[in-house]
Amino acid sequence: RGAVTNTPNRFDPLHIEPDTVEPDEEDFERRQPTEYFDDASRSILAKNDSPDVGFAYSLNPYRGCSHGCVYCYARPTHEYLGFSAGLDFETKILVKQDAPDLLRETFSKRSWEPQVVALSGNTDCYQPVERQLEITRRCLEVFLEFRNPVTMITKNKLVTRDIDLLQELAERDLVHVTLSVTSLKPALTGVLEPRTSRPKQRLAAVTALAEAGVPVGINVAPLIPGLNDEEVPNILDAAAKAGAQWANYIMVRLPGAVRPLFLEWLERHMPDRASKVQNR
């Protein structure tokens, strides 16, 4: 897991503190399996009003993300569901089984004007459970059916499973795919974003997509001064060699409960860098 603990839910008047300082790690893992819940949402597109991103709507097939990226800015959204932004965000995943049908319903409305939709904003549409459920794949089929443009961002090599659909979308200039590459060091990504694809696998996905004619680039995201900023030249070089057509970066953001989670992670996994990172 990425988070070390569950932070208190800011909307919950009660908070339980464990009576042990250092829980047994194996026992803790046994007690924290990933649980999946049905999400009964009756709409599927979230409207974006921020001028900082280049799309008006996003689609999140899931809520929460088992990738476990400790820095994830979306963690506080789990608090609105009655969960913690900490381990709950990684272990209690809401699944929108009806997402493809709801998307088709939306695109069928006379009021809908085709425009770019992002997969995703607050989750990774290719997190591990997607391998079995194929909700993202079925959504891509709807995008293709209605010739609606889509932009995708992921940290998972599973995106290459859908190359057949992405090729068809690319032939109609309807898709862009971005792989987030935080570091080229597996030892770092293995604790920073533990259930994502490893760096070489993401770069291999870039190559596979580029060779298939799918527009693909990378995000150096998040950029964490004192932790991965010195890697930027090497990441850009590796991405260019892999076939990336563009590169962006996003500075780390630590809203709400994410800040204490990240600082706790630093002290646990990178104590020698904790002070440097906090003071940058």
Language-model regions: role of each:
Residues 1-40, 46-47, 230-280:
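Auxiliary Fe-S-binding modules of radical SAM enzymes
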Residues 27-62, 70-178, 182-189, 199-206, ...:
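Conserved Radical SAM active-site core
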Residues 167-169, 195, 237:
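Short, solvent-exposed amphipathic alpha-helical segments in soluble enzyme
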Residues 149, 215, 245:
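Residue-level detector of anion-binding/catalytic polar loops
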Residues 157-160, 224-233:
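Active-site glycine- and acidic-residue-rich loops that bind
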Residues 184, 192-195, 208-229, 252-254:
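Conserved strand-turn element in the central/C-terminal portion of the radical SAM core barrel
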